[in-house]
């Protein structure tokens, strides 16, 4: 008889992290930081994406290249490495680097939820501790197919990762036709999301925004996905995937995105601020 998995917790650089087993799904774990959900990982089936925002990032990655084709990916923000594990399973041979600022958090995840490291050819997942922007600035130009920014200090995206200067660093790291994707969160009146869309539009000629209809209408707080590229994004395929998901979402691009942005100006380092805090109880769990 095997021991049942039990929750584990540890004080990290950014708060108190807790790994809790999902009693309804063998091999699945929830990572929280100060009570705010950060990641959900299924060790038995890494293609299972529980959270709505990870499913949207998964759909985006699925649509960017033919099925199974390896990608060179930089993940800014690690958590429990949900998306890196997904891509390792769906696109074997991908070279992935994860940058997580919270070293003790990364150690906790490595100890209890280990992942496949890189092989001699560099395929696999390499995780390092560091600041996302510093790591991005040190990358060789044109070295990545996909850059994913999913950085939350607790429940807020740090200001220095929200500016035109930051997005330009991401653009420089991408190969021609590569994609930059940012997972953000905002609520009524969507001032932060509009400004972030304006920021990505100032750098990339092709941009789309994805969110639940209720979030787009300014009725509630929720996740917002922004994607930018130098090449046309597969918008029709993505719109179909997002609309048909168990967490349906709308894709906004072109003139509709311009109308949503309105007069919002791109954010610069000089005026950047952290993303707005969620309303009380928006994401907290025990």
Each language-model region and where it sits:
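A generic structural signal for alpha->beta connector loops
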Residues: 93-95, 122-124, 177, 204-206, ...
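Rossmann-like AdoMet
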Residues: 1-67, 89-92, 123
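C-terminal substrate-binding/active-site "lid" region of AdoMet-derived donor-dependent transferases
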Residues: 165-235
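Residues that form or immediately flank small-molecule/cofactor binding pockets and catalytic motifs
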Residues: 24, 103, 132, 212-214
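SAM/dcSAM-binding transferase cores
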Residues: 2-23, 38-44, 217-286
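The AdoMet/dcAdoMet-binding core of the Class I SAM-like
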Residues: 44-172, 188-191, 197
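Alpha-helical subdomain
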Residues: 161, 186-193, 199, 214, ...
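A short, flexible beta-alpha/helix-coil linker loop
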Residues: 36-40, 152-155, 180, 187
């Amino acid at each position: 008889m095997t021991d049942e998995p039990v929750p584990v917790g540890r004080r990290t650089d950014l708060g108190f992290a807790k790994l809790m087993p999902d009693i309804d799904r063998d091999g699945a774990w929830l990572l929280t930081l100060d009570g705010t959900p950060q990641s959900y990982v299924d060790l038995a089936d890494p293609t299972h994406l529980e959270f709505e925002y990870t499913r949207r990032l998964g759909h985006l990655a699925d649509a960017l290249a033919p099925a199974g084709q390896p990608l060179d990916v930089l993940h800014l923000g690690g958590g429990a490495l949900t998306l890196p594990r997904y891509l390792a399973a769906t696109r074997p041979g991908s070279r992935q680097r994860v940058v997580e600022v919270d070293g003790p958090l990364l150690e906790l995840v490595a100890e209890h939820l280990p992942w496949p490291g890189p092989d001699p050819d560099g395929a696999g997942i390499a995780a390092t501790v560091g600041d996302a922007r510093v790591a991005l600035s040190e990358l060789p130009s044109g070295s990545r197919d996909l850059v994913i920014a999913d950085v939350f200090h607790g429940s807020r995206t740090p200001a220095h990762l929200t500016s035109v200067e930051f997005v330009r660093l991401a653009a420089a790291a991408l190969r021609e036709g590569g994609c930059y994707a940012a997972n953000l969160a905002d609520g009524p009146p969507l001032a932060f999301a509009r400004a972030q869309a304006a920021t990505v539009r100032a750098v990339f000629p092709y941009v789309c925004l994805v969110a639940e209809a209720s979030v787009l209408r300014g009725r509630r707080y929720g996740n917002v996905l922004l994607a930018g590229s130098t090449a046309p994004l597969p918008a029709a395929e993505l719109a179909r995937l997002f609309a048909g998901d168990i967490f349906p979402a709308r894709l906004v691009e072109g003139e509709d995105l311009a109308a949503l942005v309105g007069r919002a100006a791109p954010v610069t380092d000089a005026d950047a601020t952290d993303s707005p805090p969620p309303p009380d109880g928006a994401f907290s769990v025990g």
